A protein has these predicted regions:
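Basic nucleic-acid-binding interfaces
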Residues: 1-19, 31-61
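Minor-groove-contacting beta-hairpin "wing" of winged helix-turn-helix DNA-binding domains
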Residues: 24-28
Length: 61
């Protein structure tokens, strides 16, 4: 799964981009606590990293 795919899923679930520095982008949700950091741009994220990001966002893969 690429970082673009993860970002599309996050945006569809209501997460919005709040900060980017270097190769990492942070997203925040208006109703959920915390921030999610996505390494971007990256063609293929390791499977464990992709699952952890989706789990933290409350999205089922």
């Amino acid at each position: 799964m690429s970082s673009d795919d993860i970002i599309k899923l996050l945006k569809a679930a209501g997460w919005r981009k709040v900060h980017q520095k270097g190769s990492h982008t942070q997203f925040k949700h208006s109703a959920k606590p915390g921030k999610i950091t996505v390494p971007h741009p990256k063609k293929d994220l390791p499977l464990g990293t992709a699952r952890a990001i989706l789990k933290q966002a409350g999205i089922q893969p």
